[in-house]
Every structure is written in structure tokens, then in C-alpha cells.
């Protein structure tokens, strides 16, 4: 008689449950029990009821509000609790950790079988309009993280994840219960954790890219900041590279003209990608747009990635591409491919590639649409890649756009262009609106690609505009590159039409959208809002980590040994930034913080005096 191994049985059960909504509800209920409040005062109960009455759960755009500190209330030491209560909570935490460990074990087994070929392709955008963006002046918000420097960190799991009854009551009343919701757009709240100048200002024309732990934003443009930079003789574009840590929801200025001598000046409508945890940019334009273009490649090293910060311009030779902006780039094997772009006057769809081993450029295809069936020249298109073809989505010229129904794709093996007819989403068809189930032709939109659990490559596009600058989009669509089928995401939509923004995705299947120009009531304003959307149901351990960081955005205050002893797997603790030291004087900002050259100096001084 064959007896089922208990360990194998556990793996089978978890594998069957991880993709079910029942188990997701179990996780949410379990987390709620962990953070339950045993004693709530009358004032706290009234505050909780008031907050719950004002909570709107029907919006597609949900804001994860962070708990606010009560003004004027001094920090209190953790009160003594009954041993029974402490033991119960400790057991609850240990159970959650064991669940996360089991999920991590399952994930590691799956990772050995998976051979993901995710390639995130990002490139720049540009615009020549002169709208002005309001400068944010959020005050620095002190939190309970700011304790005396001499206070020793507790290594107990209870002190890492559990707080006093008062703090738990505030958490229960001010933070909605965590709920994992795929294909829902969520606004990331980060401003209350920074002083003015401690996060990127509103911008367009920037590019973002993501690793497992950080989001990176390079360059961009804002006319208001450009005027200030002009008066001081600085670059009129944002000559800076920012990083955003997903776990702590904090921004950090990694590089700028002050600490990186080789920082490029063509930082609008460039292309940005990540390869072996190194950022690579190509092309771009300075300001005024089209007057100064680039065909250089730059490599960026950041402290967030554990490297010595710096920027290097690659030394290349061979048949270099034309200096232009608005191309799309893909890394295939050891080659960097670039397709399309514009000098400001001429538009191309030529294909070049750079051998990253030798630094030699090679022209592999010159498009001649007037002579053969080649795609017409364009910029502000997006490119996605399935290992055999590079698909070119949309894009256009200064007055035209290209459709998303018949898609040109460069064949990497045959060195030619193929065309693929796509299939519509019949649910999204609207005869009155002229929509036949396809996304409308557009440019200046964003696109990321992700490999689903079935192995299919899926491309997600958001926002954009048409060539006449009169129609703007806030919709989100998905294209399956295997079936060539379009699907409109019905559960998520941008809060307002958005263009000249940028998007990126992390390997766990989460998409991020940052910045851009917002169109509302015939007014256009640049933004620095950050949104996230899970494109798929990730691994169970990823959901557990997302829930932990939702309730605890200060894990970087604890040393890694404490977190490992609490049961958090090493691959998650490695996503945290370097451990912060608790500062003695909470009225002064961190001296190691780099302040953006484009911040408002008067507002920055007033908030730190």
C-alpha cells in the first residue's frame, strides 16, 4: 500500500489552494486576526467609526492611506501585556511565518521549473506644451519610527510586527483591511513620508523601469522647473535618477548632475531598460526638443542595487544609428536592438543592434515603406518581445497615429517584417462609439509585458492620445501575443486621461504607472502620482510579503538578523533598502538625503528651519 508523504500532501494542498479566492479570503481573515485590537477606548472607537463611514470601497482607484500620527501626542513606551495575550499573538505571528515559509518553499520549487523570458521595454516621451504644474509642499510627517538613538532595537518578533494597544487601535481605525485585488489600480501614498524635494516633482517625458525591489525614474520635463533651471544656468530637463523602494514606499535621489559628472542632458524621450540589474539608456533629446538629439548609450550604477553610484557613457563603434528620440529598445541575447524614432523632422522604423560584448553597432534593416511592405516611420510607439519577434505597437508622427489592429513585428531570425492581425474583445465593442473591440489608435501611451502562469506573453497598455491632440485615453488593455487577442480591463481605469507618462513592471507581476500629463476639463497638468496594478495572481509568498509591507512600511529600521529570525525569507529582506538609523533630533531631515536641484528652495528651507 502506498502511503502519501505528509510533506508532499502539504505541497499539493497549498498548490491547489493558492489560486483560489477561498484561500485569499482566508489569508485576509488571518491577517485581520493578527492585527485585532483587544481593547478599544470610547474615543478610539468613535474615531474608527468615523473613518469607516467615510471609506468608499466602490472606486476603481483605491488609495492605501497610511496611518497618521496624532498631533501633539508624545511617543509612549509599549505597555505591559498579559502573558497569555502575548503568547497568543506570538503564536499567531509564528503561524503566519510558517505559512510564508511553506509558500516560499513552493515558490522555489516552481522557480526551478520556470524559464521566464520577461523583457520590460521602456523608452522616453516628449512634448512641447507649456502647461504648469502645482508644486507639492507636503510637510514632513514625523512618525513613531523617530525614537531616541540610544534606544536599543528589540529583536523580538512581537516588537517587529506588533505595537501597543493604542497604536493597534489607531491602525484598525485608519487603515483599511488588506485585500489582494488583481487587475485593480491602486494609488501609492508616499508624500507623507518625505519633505518637499524628497520625491520627484511632476514631470512628463521621463522613463521608468523596475527591479524586484525598486522602481527607477530617469529624466523628464516640467516647464515650471525648466524656467527655474534656466535662471540658474542648469539643464532645462530633470537631470536626475530617482529610486522608489516598494517595501518602504520611499523615494531616494540616486544620481544627479551634482554627484555624477557624466549625467546626460538628452533626458526626454529616451529609452530605458534593465539588464543584469544595471540600467541602460539610449537616445533622447534635450530642450528645445529636437534641437539636440543623442544616439549614445549610458550605464547607471545605483546604491540601491548595491553598486558604487555613477554614470558611464559606453564607448562604441561601427555603424551607429541616427541621433534621435522616441525609439523602442529590446535586449535579445547579447544584443541591444533599437527600432524607430525621430530627429524632430524625419521619422524612421529602421532596426539597429549593439553587441554588448564588443560595443559594435550594426544596421540590420532599413525600412523602405515606399518600396516594399515595411512599417512607416514613427516615434512614441511601444515595443514588446516574445523571443522571436519584436512587436511595434501604435506610435505616430506629429500629426498622425497608427492603429493597434494590424501589428508589424520584426522577425529576429529571418531579418524581415511580419504582420499579425489581432482579434477584438467583443465585450468592449461599442457601435455608437465607433469601437469594434480594439483599442483606438494612439501614441504617447505606456506599455509593459509580463509572462503569465501559462507561459503566454501579455502586453498591457495604458492611456495615450490621438494625433489631433483632441482625444485622450484613460483605458487599460491587454494583448496576448500568442493568441493575438485583445482584452479590455473592465475592473481598472486611470482616474483621468493620461499621456506622456511611463510604466514598468516587476518580475512578480505588478505594473506601476508614474507621472505624465493629466487631461481634465480642457486643462492639462503634469503629475507625479504613482499607481500600481497586479497583472496576475502572483505566488502566495508574494501576496504575504505585500500584506506585511502594507501594515509595516518601516521594516528598514530593523537589522536583517531580526527579520530573518522573525521568519521572513532572505530573498524578501534583500528587497529592503539599507537599515536606517533612528535619529535623535526628529526636527532635522536626514543629512544623507539628496535634495533635488529642481525643488523649491524657499519651501524646502521653511520646512527644515
From Swiss-Prot:
**Recorded GO CC terms:** Cul2-RING ubiquitin ligase complex
Q: Where are the Kelch repeats?
A: 214-277, 279-334, 335-381, 389-437, 458-508, 510-554
Q: Which InterPro entries match?
A: Kelch-typ_b-propeller, KLHDC10
Organism lineage reads as: Eukaryota, Metazoa, Ecdysozoa, Arthropoda, Hexapoda
One Pfam family recorded for the sequence: Kelch_4
Protein name according to UniProt? Kelch domain-containing protein 10 homolog
Taxonomic source organism:
Drosophila melanogaster (Fruit fly)
GO terms under biological process: positive regulation of stress-activated MAPK cascade
Role? Activates the Pk92B/DASK1-MAPK signaling cascade.
Q: Does the keyword Cytoplasm apply?
A: no
Q: Which residues form a coiled coil?
A: none
Amino acid at each position: 500500500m502506498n502511503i502519501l508523504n505528509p510533506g508532499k500532501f502539504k505541497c499539493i494542498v497549498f498548490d491547489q489552494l493558492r489560486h483560489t479566492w477561498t484561500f485569499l479570503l482566508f489569508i485576509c481573515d488571518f491577517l485581520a486576526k493578527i492585527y485585532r485590537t483587544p481593547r478599544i477606548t470610547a474615543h478610539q472607537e468613535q474615531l474608527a467609526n468615523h473613518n469607516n463611514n467615510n471609506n468608499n470601497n466602490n472606486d476603481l482607484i483605491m488609495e492605501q492611506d497610511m496611518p497618521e500620527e496624532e498631533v501633539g501626542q508624545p511617543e509612549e513606551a509599549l505597555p505591559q501585556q498579559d502573558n497569555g495575550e502575548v503568547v497568543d499573538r506570538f503564536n499567531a505571528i509564528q503561524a503566519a511565518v510558517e505559512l510564508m515559509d511553506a509558500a516560499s518553499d513552493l515558490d522555489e520549487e516552481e522557480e526551478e521549473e520556470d524559464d521566464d523570458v520577461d523583457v520590460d521595454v521602456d523608452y522616453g516621451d516628449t512634448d512641447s506644451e507649456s502647461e504648469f504644474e502645482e508644486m507639492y509642499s507636503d510637510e514632513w510627517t514625523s512618525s513613531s519610527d523617530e525614537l531616541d538613538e540610544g534606544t536599543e532595537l528589540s529583536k523580538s518578533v512581537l516588537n517587529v510586527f506588533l505595537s501597543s494597544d493604542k497604536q493597534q487601535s489607531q491602525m484598525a481605525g485608519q487603515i483599511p483591511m488588506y485585500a489582494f485585488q488583481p487587475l485593480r489600480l491602486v494609488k501609492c501614498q508616499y508624500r507623507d513620508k518625505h519633505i518637499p524635494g524628497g520625491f520627484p516633482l511632476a514631470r512628463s517625458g521621463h522613463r521608468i523601469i523596475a527591479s524586484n525591489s525598486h522602481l527607477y525614474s530617469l529624466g523628464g520635463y516640467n516647464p515650471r522647473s525648466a524656467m527655474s533651471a534656466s535662471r540658474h544656468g542648469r539643464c532645462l530637463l530633470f537631470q536626475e535618477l530617482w529610486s522608489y523602494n516598494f517595501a518602504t514606499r520611499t523615494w531616494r535621489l540616486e544620481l544627479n548632475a551634482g554627484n555624477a559628472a557624466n549625467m546626460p542632458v538628452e533626458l526626454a524621450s529616451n529609452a530605458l531598460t534593465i539588464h543584469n540589474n544595471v540600467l541602460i539608456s539610449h537616445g533622447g533629446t534635450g530642450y528645445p526638443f529636437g534641437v539636440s538629439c543623442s544616439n549614445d548609450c549610458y550605464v547607471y550604477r545605483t546604491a540601491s542595487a548595491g553598486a558604487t553610484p555613477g554614470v558611464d557613457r559606453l564607448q562604441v563603434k561601427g555603424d551607429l544609428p541616427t541621433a534621435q528620440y522616441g525609439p523602442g529598445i529590446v535586449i535579445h541575447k547579447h544584443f541591444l536592438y533599437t527600432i524607430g524614432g525621430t530627429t524632430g523632422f524625419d521619422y524612421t522604423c529602421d532596426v539597429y543592434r549593439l553587441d554588448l560584448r564588443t560595443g559594435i553597432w550594426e544596421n540590420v534593416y532599413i525600412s523602405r515603406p515606399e518600396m516594399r511592405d515595411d512599417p512607416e516611420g514613427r516615434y512614441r510607439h511601444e515595443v514588446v518581445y516574445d523571443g522571436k519577434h519584436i512587436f511595434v505597437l501604435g506610435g505616430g508622427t506629429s500629426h498622425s497615429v497608427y492603429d493597434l489592429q494590424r501589428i508589424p513585428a520584426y522577425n529576429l531570425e529571418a531579418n524581415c517584417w511580419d504582420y499579425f492581425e489581432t482579434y477584438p474583445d467583443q465585450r468592449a465593442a461599442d457601435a455608437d462609439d465607433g469601437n469594434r473591440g480594439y483599442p483606438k489608435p494612439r501614441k504617447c501611451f505606456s506599455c509593459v509585458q509580463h509572462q503569465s502562469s501559462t507561459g503566454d506573453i501579455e502586453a498591457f497598455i495604458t492611456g495615450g492620445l490621438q494625433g489631433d491632440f483632441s482625444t485622450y485615453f484613460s483605458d487599460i488593455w491587454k494583448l496576448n501575443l500568442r493568441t493575438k487577442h485583445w482584452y479590455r480591463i473592465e475592473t481598472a481605469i486611470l482616474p483621468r486621461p493620461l499621456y506622456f507618462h511611463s510604466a514598468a513592471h516587476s518580475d512578480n507581476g505588478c505594473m506601476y504607472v508614474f507621472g505624465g500629463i493629466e487631461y481634465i476639463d480642457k486643462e492639462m497638468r503634469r503629475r507625479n502620482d504613482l499607481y500600481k496594478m497586479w497583472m496576475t495572481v502572483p505566488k502566495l509568498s508574494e501576496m504575504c510579503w505585500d500584506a506585511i509591507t502594507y501594515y509595516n512600511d518601516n521594516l528598514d529600521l530593523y537589522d536583517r538578523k531580526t527579520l530573518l529570525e522573525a521568519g521572513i525569507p532572505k530573498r524578501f529582506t534583500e528587497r529592503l533598502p539599507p537599515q536606517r538609523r533612528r535619529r535623535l533630533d526628529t526636527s532635522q531631515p536626514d543629512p544623507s538625503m539628496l535634495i533635488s536641484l529642481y525643488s523649491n528652495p524657499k519651501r524646502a528651507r521653511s520646512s527644515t528651519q
